[in-house]
UniProtKB/Swiss-Prot annotation:
One of its GO terms (cellular component) is extrinsic component of plasma membrane. Its cofactor is Mn(2+). This is UDP-2,3-diacylglucosamine hydrolase. Belongs to the LpxH family. Pfam families: Metallophos (PF00149). It comes from Bordetella parapertussis (strain 12822 / ATCC BAA-587 / NCTC 13253). The gene is lpxH. The keyword Nuclease does not apply. HAMAP family: LpxH. Its EC number is 3.6.1.54. The keyword Aminoacyl-tRNA synthetase does not apply. Its main location: membrane.
Amino acid sequence: MNKLALQGPLWLASDLHLGPATPATAEAFLGLLQAAADEASALLLPGDIFDAWIGDDVIRAAPPWLAAVLQGIRAAAGRIPVYLGRGNRDFLIGQELADALGAHLLPEPVLLETDYGRILLTHGDEYCTDDSAYQQFRAMVRNPQWQAQFLAMSIPERLAMAEQARGESQAANQAKSMEIMDVNPASVEAALREADVDVLVHGHTHRPARHVLSVDGRKRERWVLPDWDCDHADPPRGGWLVIDRDGLQCFDLVEDED
């Protein structure tokens, strides 16, 4: 399994779903980047930073909203290590983007060796095994051959395809139960058992919480990162997780501003 040893306070945030229609969320994220650079020893972003990512070549002619976000990440990465993860929306994030930002690609899953101990980190969609249709889609788009064919298309073609896929996904999700779209408990237990860890952190489900489990007679924890929406949600929402020698603590974006 991939391992990453990091010391000091680690900040984690995921599921920002940044795009042209999320200026307030982007502004809040830029604030997080600045705060993390001041207070954290590393920032980890395990997936769905962007609502869609059709290939790293978009940065060569980035629209204003994207250019501002990239500049914010680049500035933070100049001060602390920043790790970019791939989610179900931005699975095409690659080395070109990481290099352009001075950031690192976050392997998935990854075993973090922290001041608090060993922690398993991943985006989380791989645990939603009850949603068989999504798992088939995930396997397809993670296939290197499919990705090569997609990236060979023009940017307008890729944008149109991504928009169509997003619409189909939203329509399909409306017909699915919330339970199907959540993680499968057996999949989570298997991951904890295989990694031999007591703490799992993931995003994806947009259900921030700390779950206490018992697996093989051991107390384990599953921490779910919050999603962000400062543009369309009322009240706005978002947050991040801090891991340090004292443990894990989740901070709410709105409460922290107050």
